Amino acid sequence: MLPTNRNRPQQRPARSWYFISDMDFSDPKRKPRYLSKILMVALLTAMCVVMLTQPPCHRRTPSVFSIHEPGVTHVLVTGGAGYIGSHAALRLLKDSFRVTIVDNLSRGNMGAIKVLQNLFSEPGRLQFIYADLGDPKAVNRIFAENAFDAVMHFAAVAYVGESTLEPLRYYHNITSNTLVVLEAMAAHNVRTLIYSSTCATYGEPEKMPITEGTPQFPINPYGKAKKMAEDIILDFSKSKKADMAVMILRYFNVIGSDPEGRLGEAPKPELREHGRISGACFDAALGIIPGLKVKGTDYETPDGTCVRDYIDVTDLVDAHVKALNKAERGKVGIYNVGTGKGRSVKEFVEACKKATGVDIKVDYFPRRPGDYAEVYSDPAKINSELNWTAQHTDLLESLRVAWTWQKKHRSGYGPPQAMVL
């Protein structure tokens, strides 16, 4: 029989746990706290085991857009939901470029993005990011999360008349936002920029046609804002650490649409009064507006109306792609993109009547502030250096192609609720 000693009970020594400091289970007040620590350690250990043992297919893999892939050029297209930007994205995708579109949809159309996504649905071809270039943090994050090889910068408000009414908006949207893009490019080592500029930077030159050497004296906030953006780009490109490939394309009045009828021009309803003359002609032909308003009949031109160089959007985006392919680090190229032939507004309206088959009502009004009498290009430099020549120079045919799209899309790309991704 084992001896007992009830009068002198022996105290059991407290266990020590080497992985938790100050552990003393002999103290009942501390026991709950110690148990919670043990449970937390066990939980963290279990989580680590699960993460390390799960199959590779369940682990998050980097997006293809965040990786530089040999043989694939990844182009950021700002304003890619807009009229010109969407056509440029279409051409890039057709030519097997990888494309990221950034747009805040203030002027662009989600419908154009949807068309492109349906055409190029293969993984790694196209992504759309909703963002405002006026937000430096958002822009920097986009550059940090994506491996861009080049930027085509289209995003901008672009109506001469509107710029005279809201000049500060134009300087902020065009000039300031271009600076934001440049800073992000510099921070993330993206060295190729194709910049969408305008003949409006020349103002009202004394001599025609306009060459790249024609002095730039813009006469409206739109042209001035673009000129400032050009100056910023050129100054930065000259700095030793920039080492950039820069192409600045100053283009003239854009018309037309995708020849296959996939994309077209669809300005927001509230902006139609500021829009291009082709859009106004089509709206009049469709009965959306009662007639066409021609502003200015007393210019020093053959028929008193403004003379412009009308460039088809298909030719314009071809110039951008050729500029991208020819861009070289440490070099800057500046090119006019036009047909080299001027047409008066009256000529344009007559061509639009023929293209639509509608006898459009025309009303004449005084000049619009900020407009200039005559502007057309000398495309010799771009012809020679980029081997680019406008192919769609038949004004009537360009208008017919655009009219085909407009007839099928009276409300643009459709109601917003039908375009949610």
UniProtKB/Swiss-Prot annotation:
InterPro entries: NAD(P)-bd_dom, NAD(P)-bd_dom_sf, UDP_G4E. It catalyses: UDP-beta-L-arabinopyranose = UDP-alpha-D-xylose. Its EC number is 5.1.3.5. It is found in: Golgi apparatus, Golgi stack membrane. Keywords: Carbohydrate metabolism, Golgi apparatus, Isomerase, Membrane, NAD, Signal-anchor, Transmembrane, Transmembrane helix. One of its GO terms (cellular component) is Golgi cisterna membrane. The active site is at Y222. Residues 1-33 are cytoplasmic. NCBIfam families: galE. Residues 54-421 are lumenal. Its cofactor is NAD(+). Pathway: Nucleotide-sugar biosynthesis; UDP-L-arabinose biosynthesis; UDP-L-arabinose from UDP-alpha-D-xylose: step 1/1; Cell wall biogenesis; cell wall polysaccharide biosynthesis. Pfam families: GDP_Man_Dehyd. The chain crosses the membrane at residues 34-53. NAD(+) binds at residues 74-105. This is Probable UDP-arabinose 4-epimerase 1. Belongs to the NAD(P)-dependent epimerase/dehydratase family. GO terms for biological process: capsule polysaccharide biosynthetic process; galactose metabolic process; UDP-L-arabinose biosynthetic process. It is a single-pass type II membrane protein. It is an enzyme of class 5 (isomerase).
